[in-house]
Amino acid sequence: MITITFSLTNQNKFFVKIKKADVMKLEYKYQKEMTFIGYYTEIKMNEGYEKCPEFWDKEYGEKYSKLFTTMIPENDVERAILENNIGMYALCVDNGGEFQYWIAGEYKGGSVPDGFSLYSFPESEWALFSTKGPSLLPFRN
């Protein structure tokens, strides 16, 4: 099991503590403003470990598995997924006692299909976690 703890300081910086981090790479990087496109759900802070994987399975796995077999979009939603690499990012946006959990991609312009939203982060320092292999496996085990 991997435990990730985020702490936000009063200077809008955060610290990350990871246990069993040998399966993930952590890199700090300054990023210019970035805008993402995707879809999200509201999750209570104490339910993230259970609800985040469920959201991926339901919203991404079940709905778009055919798309990733053919790589031929059949509608505006599938086109947006391919053009913006939706699924490349999992974003967590604090919303008080809950957080918005996003399945997202970097917005490259164009139309925003119904059910999708845009979210922009100001320029700041980022903590980037990456892994090779099946997506979400490090968070689920």
Model-derived features: positions:
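A solvent-exposed interaction/effector surface
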Residues: 4-141
